[in-house]
Curated annotation (Swiss-Prot):
Belongs to the UDP-glycosyltransferase family. Keywords: Glycosyltransferase, Signal, Transferase. SUPFAM superfamilies: UDP-Glycosyltransferase/glycogen phosphorylase (SSF53756). Residues 1-17 form the signal peptide. One of its GO terms (molecular function) is UDP-glycosyltransferase activity. InterPro entries: Ecdysteroid_UDP-Glc_Trfase, UDP-glycosyltransferase, UDP_glucos_trans, UDP_glycos_trans_CS. This is Ecdysteroid UDP-glucosyltransferase. Catalyzes the transfer of glucose from UDP-glucose to ecdysteroids which are insect molting hormones. Expression of egt interferes with normal insect development and block molting. The lineage of its organism: Viruses, Viruses incertae sedis, Naldaviricetes, Lefavirales, Baculoviridae. Its EC number is 2.4.1.-.
């Protein structure tokens, strides 16, 4: 009787239970905060989700019962490999910067692709693949083109790509959106979007590097899954939808077809309200009458490999802020290897949302990551950004443009400049908070929550996904996955 009632309610609501496969291999903690929220939202809508993922977060852990099931397939070797990859990036590192356009090459990124290969060769994953199960849709991490092979292995299920923030140019190309422009829509790997000849050359070089990376990935795919495995370009044809966890205003209001959905950002903030700080730390912050500055460069930066001179610059900055408490998220080994100024509390981990929501936290020195900036915006804490990799350069520049942060040059910044920037955002804190409120009003204007929007379009792909040969069922534009030589040159006669 209960089953019949539940089935009836689902039918009336326009949704039916679906079996969903999510392949989310990159072991980056902040990314999985977003993916966890998405998967749990699917389960809350009574969908059954099987997740191939590293052991970072327990997606099934929750304080409530869900009508859908979450099954986790652990690719557990990947977290250690990923740390090794980040650590090895020191060979290409500039002062304080892990990765920019000069280090984004096919050669450097093959280590990441090989990590995906090894994850999918994991005993847990091989055992799962041997079950020959069927799914209604396959959701794949947008940064991991190698994982598109799961759309082939579980065909004819349509494919959705999801990103915790910005999309890659290749993601946009796959679904027929505007993927590239050196000025208006710069590649997210660039550290500057200045529109000059150098910018155009960088765009062209990045395009060629990712084409080479795709060809090398093709060779690995055929070795791992058989000689008849489609190429990356062919696998992209299966992608029907791209979900991006940010508001389009950050992406310069890029012109996109409905196959690209900007969720608005802050998806992970829907999981649960901020937790309370531990008692001792809360006492310290309560006593910080001149304010506390929180310093964290995110979960992907290995502070053990921070350039020594950059590390000293940070310590000199903290000393200049001697009338304020500084909370510094840093590995224990680093904290023990230096002489900390008396105003610094150094720990390997802080509950970031709880810290930012404390009334005495007055500034946030950050790498400019999307999840961190979402948390700071909601807490109304002005930011000073020191971007270090990937989309952080572009995102930091946008935050400064909107008047909610200062963005500094990580390679050249001095202790005096950093201390001055921190002092400026604190002195002008009320104006920063007003601009943060205005930005949040824009971002939150859509009545649908990020989770609701993600579920709505996921369910649309599930419903119409097997009819994609009918043009009225597709969300993509006719230019989807078209080679640029055809896109610009070839016309019907």
């Amino acid at each position: 009787m209960i089953f019949i009632l539940l089935t009836t309610l689902l039918a009336v609501g326009g949704a039916q239970t679906a079996n969903i496969l999510a392949v989310l291999p990159t072991p980056a903690y902040s990314h999985h905060l977003v993916y966890q929220a998405y998967v749990q939202a699917l389960a809350d809508k009574c969908h059954n989700v099987t997740v191939v993922k590293p052991q970072l977060l327990d997606y099934a852990a929750a304080n409530k019962q869900r009508c859908g099931r979450i099954e986790q397939i652990d690719a557990d070797m990947s977290s250690q490999q990923y740390k090794k990859l980040v650590a090895s990036s020191g060979a290409f590192r500039k002062r304080g910067v892990v990765s920019d356009e000069t280090t984004v090459t096919a050669e450097n990124y093959m280590g990441l692709v090989e990590m995906f290969r090894d994850q999918f060769d994991n005993a847990h994953v091989r055992s799962f693949l041997a079950t020959n199960r069927t799914f209604d849709v396959v959701v794949v991490e947008a940064f991991a083109d190698y994982a598109l092979v799961f759309g082939h292995l579980f065909r004819p299920a349509p494919v959705i790509q999801i990103a915790p923030g910005y999309g890659l140019a290749e993601n946009f190309d796959a679904v027929g959106a505007v993927g590239r422009h050196p000025v208006h829509y710069p590649n997210i790997w660039r550290s500057s979007s200045i529109g000059n000849a150098d910018g155009a050359l960088i765009e062209w070089r990045l395009y060629n590097e990712f084409e080479l990376l795709a060809r090398r990935s093709d060779a690995l795919l055929k070795l791992q899954f058989g000689p008849n495995t489609p190429t990356i370009r062919q696998l992209r044809n299966n992608v029907q939808l791209l979900l991006l966890n940010l508001h389009p205003v950050y992406d310069n209001n890029r012109p996109v077809p409905p196959s690209v959905q900007y969720l608005g950002g802050g998806l992970h903030l829907t999981l649960e309200p901020p937790q309370r700080l531990d008692i001792e730390l809360e006492k310290r912050l309560n006593a910080s009458v001149n304010g506390t500055v929180y310093v964290s460069f995110g979960s992907s930066i290995d502070t053990n490999s921070i350039h020594a001179e950059f590390l000293q610059m940070l310590l000199d900055t903290f000393a200049k802020l001697d009338n304020r408490t500084v909370l510094w998220k840093v590995d224990d080994a680093v904290a023990k290897s230096v002489v900390l100024p008396r105003n610094v509390i150094a720990q390997k981990w802080f509950n970031q949302r709880a810290v930012l929501n404390h009334r005495n936290v007055v500034a946030f020195v950050t790498q400019g990551g999307l999840q961190s900036s979402d948390e700071a915006l909601h807490a109304r804490v002005p930011m000073v950004c020191l971007p270090m990799m990937g989309d952080q350069f572009h995102h930091s520049a946008k935050l400064e443009q909107f008047g909610v942060a200062r963005a500094l040059n990580t390679v050249t910044v001095s202790a005096a400049q950093l201390a001055l920037a921190v002092g400026d955002v604190i002195a002008d804190r009320l104006a920063y908070q007003l601009r943060m409120t205005n930005l949040l009003n824009v971002v939150a204007f859509d009545e649908a929550t990020p989770a609701d929007k993600a579920i709505k379009f996921t369910e649309r792909v599930i419903r119409f996904g097997h009819d994609i040969t009918r043009s009225e069922c597709s969300l993509k534009s006719p230019s989807a996955n078209t080679d640029y030589s055809d896109y610009f040159v070839r016309f019907p006669l």
